[in-house]
Amino acid sequence: MELVKVVNSRQMYEVDQRTICEFGTAGRELMERAGRAVVEAIAARWDGLAGLRVVVVCGKGNNGGDGYVVARLLHQNAAQVDLFLATERAAVGGDAADHLFDTEQAGVPVSELSDCSFEALDRSVVECDLVVDALLGIGLRGAPRDIAALIIDRINDSGRPVMAVDIPSGVEADTGVTPGKSVRAMVTVTFGLPKVGHLFFPGKACCGALHLVDIGFAEPALEDVQPVARLLDRDAMNSLLPRRSGDVHKGSCGTVAVVAGSVGMTGAAALTAE
């Protein structure tokens, strides 16, 4: 029985880099696959994309790059998309910059957020069917600050359904701690392996339903990871439990030893035995 590995952000980064550098999958392609997986999750939950009103909020890093792909693919599938950047275009680099360019070329309206431009975001969020959170990602350390914190407030206050890309913004992937403001998602789509922050509170509560997808990370890179934990899910638990016939009783399936209580504190032991 192979239990699902649970990793931290550094380990996931190493898997990503080995997939790119050793096994020849371009980072741009991984980003495309990640964005496509999110769009497929949206289509499955909303029974199609045409006419769906979606706000996509992106940061400057790779998490934002996934978000640019989401926005472009939604637009190409007849959704109504508003894309908001929590940074200046010039601050976006690498593969993310390439995808931002492609998204703008495809005709997606893109707005840079500043302290004086939140009115457009507020209006779009209130009117949309879904918000896609691609703001901070798994590299977050510490509390979201400045414009990111303001955006998170707007997302949460809107009351609209949220789908988080990889992890809700504000949740630390290595611990599940939320040191400041954090997005409260209905669904989180994550890639390759679950992270610690998906499974430990309060981060777990921010994730909503966790949707794990394979975007083609190299198998040797995944296999070589020494996880910080393994996930014992329902299927794994069921495989560990012996099959019992319908007429079993306490005398036919072994005995239970109770180790509990102390002198003068036997109440819990008595209740357990009963």
Task: Please state what every model-predicted region is.
Residues 122, 129-130, 135-227:
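Internal gly/pro-rich beta-alpha loop/helix module
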Residues 110-117, 145, 169-173, 236-242:
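Short gly/ser/thr-rich secondary-structure transition/capping motifs
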Residues 40-135, 143-165:
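Nucleotide and nucleotide-moiety/phosphate-recognizing core
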Residues 1-86, 93, 198-274:
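Small-residue (G/A/S/T)-rich helix-start motifs and N-terminal tracts that mark the onset
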